[in-house]
Amino acid sequence: MMNYYNDRDSKLIPGKLDGTWWEGGSMFMILIQYWFLTGDTQFNSAVQEGMYWQKGDDDFFPTNYSQYLGNDDQVFWGLAAITAAELNFPEKDGQPSWVSLAQGVFNTQVPRWDTSSCQGGLRWQIWPYQDGYGTKNAISNGGLFQLSARLALYTGNHTYAQWAERIWDWSATTPLLKEKNWNIADSTTTEANCKDHGDWQWTYNYATYISGAAYMYNYVRHSFPFFFFLFFSSVSLSPSSRIFHSPHSIPSTCTDH
């Protein structure tokens, strides 16, 4: 992974991967966890440089990419920042704290909560000229749900928990989170008042909601709805291997993105 990062065409832009922006946040989140679990510090400077370079106005919404980013793109960097805060990843003098960067993402996404359609929810993409503006998807809403839950647990501020519950409750009124069978649809559209759904199944959608539910379960001291979800989501795991399979994954096929 680091060989690819160091050899990329965009290597003069710290934190930017070729052809994609959000995956840089995902990569740094993995490297932060790697440092925490192994004690290996060799990648820490690259993580710090990339995270701070892409922080924009302390909200991971840099002007160079803001015209085409989606809410899901931004939230991955917020999740990387809250991971750094939780694991006490080293900060650099003169730079904002990791938790403040995670809060910056939360503070810019909450005003985008859209009650003009579907009685709530985050749109996938932010600007009306983007193709995904009419879509409300699981990873954007699940991402903000998880970030809110983690900020609640980390800071003790109940406002974050209230937002996590609001996102959960709204998701459950749409195909994005079906409490009857715990199916998580990839997307729904404002044109259909969020009653239709995209049938694609992606494991990161499930993982985002499951992780957020686990943080909320800890925050509210074993709340029944979140326990219920955590218990039944385990049914989706393969009994033989305990691996969560994505029905639409293609075996042995990988790309840079």
Model-based region annotation:
Residues M1-H257:
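Glycan-recognition and catalytic cores of secretory/periplasmic carbohydrate-active enzymes
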